[in-house]
Amino acid sequence: MAGVIPVWIALVATLSVFLQGINVKAATFDITNQCPYTVWAAASPGGGRQLAKGQTWTIQVAAGTTGGRVWARTGCSFDGSGRGTCQTGDCNGMLSCQGYGQVPATLAEYGLNKFQNLDFYDISLVDGFNVPLSMTPTSTNPNCKGRITCLSHINSMCPAELKVNGGCKSACARYNTAQYCCTGASANNCGPTNYSKFFKGQCPQAYSYAKDDATSTFTCPSGTNYKVVFCG
């Protein structure tokens, strides 16, 4: 029996290190509203919550989560059961989102520990624009890009053909063609258009169309936490 105890101790120690490694890769997202109006924050995964100016909602995101996004909904009305509608960013009429929202919406996107122990994060206008936002990783690692923003008030400058109540659709969302959505015959040969150049001119760090990776994707070491701020 004397030899059994050290074996179990070793197994427990190994498991502890393994679990610590998982925790390091998980992330906390602090989502704050600095807009002079109420927004209904949404996260997939995460759900949703009403935020008055100055309020913060904190969510925990599991290690290895990819395809994650955070956005603001505007012009919402919900009943006591959490059912209702939003003018922009609506997710199937639910306060607590179970999936992605409707266009237009400014997106803070991320993939945790997606490749070589790196998180990937970006701001996307591929679904259009509704609320200015910034995304800031908390890491001070020099290999981390840092804060990225899209703080231009695009709604007031939106081309008439893309304008909707409370937001500005992307050309892909408005016309749904291969040229603007980089699909079909355009999937591997898709460049910027006058519409995407408009969005890029307003928010140079944000995705302006689906293939805008080179100037719009940023990385941080896995285990980083993030702050998303609407209007700030």
Curated annotation (Swiss-Prot):
Signal peptide segment: 1-21
PROSITE patterns linked: THAUMATIN_1, THAUMATIN_2
Gene Ontology BP terms: defense response; response to salt stress; response to UV-B
Tissue expression: Strongly expressed in roots and in female and male strobili, and, to a lower extent, in cotyledons, leaves, stems and pollen grains.
Induction: Induced by UV-B and salt stress.
InterPro entries membership: Osmotin/thaumatin-like_sf, Thaumatin, Thaumatin_CS
Taxonomic superkingdom: Eukaryota
Glycan attachment positions: N194
Cystine connections: C35-C231, C76-C86, C91-C97, C144-C220, C150-C203, C158-C168, C172-C181, C182-C190
Keywords: Allergen, Disulfide bond, Glycoprotein, Pathogenesis-related protein, Plant defense, Signal, Stress response
Family per record: Belongs to the thaumatin family.
Entry function: May be involved in disease resistance.
Name of the protein in its database record: Pathogenesis-related thaumatin-like protein 3.1
Source species of the chain: Cryptomeria japonica (Japanese cedar)
Lineage: Eukaryota, Viridiplantae, Streptophyta, Embryophyta, Tracheophyta
